[in-house]
């Protein structure tokens, strides 16, 4: 992923820049659903977070959404939308497309800089997000309203979409309760790690040798450490964000044409070209 704040900022800028009045009205009308959609499969990463808890393979499902059957996901998703009319779900799905655009554009840089070391990967993403928020809104990530992206009741239309996709493409059993809990746990974890208490820091220290990852990498630092990336690299990151925003607007318009104007899938599917959320080609 880029982290939550980056995805929210991308989504907000897409709404602002959208020049199709009908689509803009849809996204503004279901703004919270759209912005949660911008978190994509990250929704499942923190299900039942904590050591030794039964996670029912839900976080792994979030990982699989990023790398397995990505084209099939977007094809099956758009077909499902054509058969199951829901503005709530459609807005969420359009946000999911934006998650893909941002991940696809930014992940190659992060993987290269982190040398595929997970702790370094997250440190870089959190520092990039912190700096981007400061530059675009003059706000510190430590003061960001982490509850705002989750402050709504998840529609059953969205849950039922995931249940369908998970079973058909990934042989993963989900339920409405699991999906609602995933959203709740995502929110709780982001709030907890924004200002981690002594308990979290202690548990992070205990967990590190067990999970081979430093949970403190999921915490926004008081200030950025520029050893992780140069100012030139940060400027390239911002350029990649702007490219992802433009890409998102194009794919949103194409998806809208498929669902609302019954256009064929060919142009829409061309946006995915065998590339997963990590920027890796699978064909």
Where in this protein do the model-derived segments appear?
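N-terminal leader/auxiliary helical segments
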Residues: 1-94, 100-283
């Amino acid at each position: 992923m880029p982290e939550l704040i980056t995805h929210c900022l991308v989504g907000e800028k897409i709404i602002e820049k959208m020049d199709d009045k009908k689509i803009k009205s849809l996204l503004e009308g279901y703004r919270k659903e759209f912005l949660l959609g911008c978190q994509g499969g990250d929704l499942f990463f923190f299900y039942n977070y904590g050591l030794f808890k039964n996670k029912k393979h839900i976080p792994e499902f979030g990982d699989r959404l990023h790398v397995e059957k990505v084209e099939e996901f977007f094809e099956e998703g758009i077909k499902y939308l054509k058969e199951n009319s829901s503005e709530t779900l459609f807005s969420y799905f359009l946000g999911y497309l934006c998650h893909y655009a941002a991940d696809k554009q930014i992940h190659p840089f992060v993987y290269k800089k982190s040398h595929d070391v997970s702790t370094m990967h997250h440190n870089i993403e959190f520092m990039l997000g912190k700096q981007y928020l400061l530059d675009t809104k003059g706000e510190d990530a430590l003061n960001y309203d982490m509850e705002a992206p989750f402050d709504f009741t998840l529609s059953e239309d969205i849950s039922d979409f995931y249940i369908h996709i998970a079973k058909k493409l990934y042989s993963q059993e989900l339920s409405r309760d699991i999906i609602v809990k995933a959203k709740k746990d995502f929110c709780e974890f982001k709030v907890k790690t924004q200002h981690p208490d002594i308990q979290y820091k202690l548990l992070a220290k205990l967990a590190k040798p067990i999970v081979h990852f430093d949970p403190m990498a999921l915490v926004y630092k008081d200030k950025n450490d520029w050893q992780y990336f140069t100012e030139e690299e940060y400027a390239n990151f911002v350029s990649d964000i702007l490219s992802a925003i433009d890409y998102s607007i194009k794919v949103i318009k194409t998806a809208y044409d498929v669902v609302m104007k019954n256009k064929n899938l060919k142009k829409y599917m061309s946006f995915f070209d065998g590339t997963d959320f990590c920027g890796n080609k699978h064909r």
